[in-house]
């Protein structure tokens, strides 16, 4: 019987099977090969199975019964705990380099630059389950009607994602350590990625206002990257100076974008000047209100509301002949990591369901890495091999996951 179309594509484009087979593992006398374990977890994540227990069921008597064969949940957890996370990171970097060679990072709007976004997300928390790598915090919550203070164990990860491409491509993740903040974790991830991928792999970094700090900005510039970061109240001196220089908000027409650019605004904390772009965007939308009349009867009324949003973006980018609206485009591209990466991986990729955790911190790291790899390669397959064949494609990632699982269950005969 012919191999699955998804696996054939990954082998043809990325030589994926050979790379997975070369991954080192720490088991001495394994009953099942490391590639078999990796394939079960990876394909389970691609089919959007939420837990290792579900993958065990599918391997025994479900869609993977012929492709993988019987595997227990304990076997999967034991093997994942003995994979080296650095080796999985090296695999991810090799795939990222191949993506760049294949032109996946090209963009119609980024003016030849490869733009990456960095952000963090909490993936799990518990008052009971924990591992040696868990972070801790004290939380007040209600238990049996009483307000109690308990230690909560949780994990956060930082993610670097290319956002200038046609679809977001995560480059790497890093688990935040106990006592480490999100900015320090993200900076360590950036440094490790560029050390492995090369200093010219990325051109520009976009981030939320949390990252607009003097040490982080200096470290990013030392890596050779330009940056565009949201400017908010966490830098009050810079924000006040930008508001003083730039004009106040005008009367914007519906759907109109107003933009002001100050190429040199003094940043007192760093004793330097940075560029600041201010945008005012007015959006007109209709909403429905339900009101009651004098007799208490409900009446639906529609009204038009004009919503105005103001944003500031700080940057070290030398625009030259490039219009300042480019800074606005870069700043808004940061939302891709929230709306398309974190949200999709949480709802469809089950990022926040750590099916292996208690006492197995390394297994959780490797499981999360494999889920991110599965999400990335499924996106590549979906956009380059599925959507590209349709003029108007109505399929989504959930539809693709169901079809992948069905094709494993009912393989097509080889016509060769």
Language-model-derived ranges and their functions:
Residues 1-4, 16-21, 255-272, 346-416:
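A short, flexible helix-boundary coil/loop motif
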Residues 3-39:
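Basic, short loop/linker segments at the boundary and entry of helix-turn-helix/winged-helix-like folds
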Residues 6-9, 55, 60, 321-357:
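Short amphipathic alpha-helical "interface-anchor" segments enriched in bulky aromatics
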Residues 28-96, 164, 220:
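Short, positively charged, Gly/Tyr-enriched micro-motifs
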Residues 40, 55, 72-76, 112-126, ...:
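Short, conserved catalytic/metal-binding motifs centered on acidic residues
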Residues 77-165:
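Active-site-proximal, Lys/Arg-enriched surface segment
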Residues 138-201:
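Electropositive, glycine- and tryptophan-enriched low-complexity nucleic-acid-binding patches
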Residues 229-334:
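An anionic, glycine-rich sequence signature occurring as long contiguous blocks
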